[in-house]
Amino acid sequence: MKALPLAKMAAAAAIMLLAAAETGRATDAVSADDAARFLAGMPPSVQSPLTPLTKDPAWQHHEKFLDAAFGQLEKRQTSKIAAWAAVNLAAPRPTMFYMFSGPDFLYANAFYSKATTYVLSALEPVGQVPDLTRLPRGSLAPGLSDVERSLGSILSFSFFITKKMKTDLRAGEFDGTLPILYVFLARSGKTIRDVSPVTLDDTGAVHSGNENAGRNPTPGVRIHFAGGDGAERTLYYFSTDLSNSGVRNSGFLKFCARLAPGNSLIKSASYLLHAGNFSTVREFILANSATIIQDDSGIPLADFDPRKWRFFPFGRYAGPIDKFPGRYQPAYAELFRRSQPMDFGIGYRWRSFESNLLLAVKVP
């Protein structure tokens, strides 16, 4: 007679244990924001499953390294860019386009902090951030070193070195652009709300990661985040070929057209927009931008219609670096004879005394 109540009690206990296990799994899930803070060398939330990992000497070294690097960058560059933008960008559009960006949200935000939608694009794959609580034993230290190495050139020189990035962003546990986007979002004071894989079909429509986007899908990621003001913002990154043949076979520019007009940033772009096989993207930027901020690796001055654009040059035009011979622009040199001073460096000539920046504003 007593066996029945005991059986019921055992069953009830089993159900409670299962429920507790499920609750534990839900509680133990690492949020995207905590993962971003951890990768950025910033403490995650107190209740995060990642908090115990911050006691690892490898993470503590990572924290000190990035604190110093971003502290120097803020003092030397990003705070000055933000001050420049506050003075010179009177009425920024809600959308900003940053072609050939790689994962460089850092400078997208520095120049256009008031944007509500950021669209970044480059060849580099989206990648992923693995479950940081389930990394193989001994892989945390080399993984964090990979992140530091991937950030090295942009923290020192303001741009990613493309060939080096191809290697760094495919190495180790943290592959692709997403881990670096996480770092820049966290270090820019953003709070990540949601991260989801997306694809574009050939009409430019956005599909969630598991939906069929047709024959020529463009892979990407959509990140919803909030700034210090609490306002919701969206960052898109798409891995796509921006050459004429590439954009002809994708819906990327059609997607961008739905968000146009916007503001554009072009820097350290390997002078690709000087070439004929990137004319489609060049023409799109000119047609769909209210303002363009660029160094001389962007759109050649000869491709701007002077009846439609006003030019505001800053800094000093010293010509292209030796790696890009034949890209000197006499018209650029003439324009920059009347330039305004600039107290930060940008682009391939990253020292402030030899950097150039052109603000082009479309005539209403």
Segment roles from a protein language model:
Residues 27-153, 233-364:
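Non-globular targeting/processing and membrane-anchoring segments
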Residues 169, 194-237:
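Short aromatic loop motif centered on NTY/YTY
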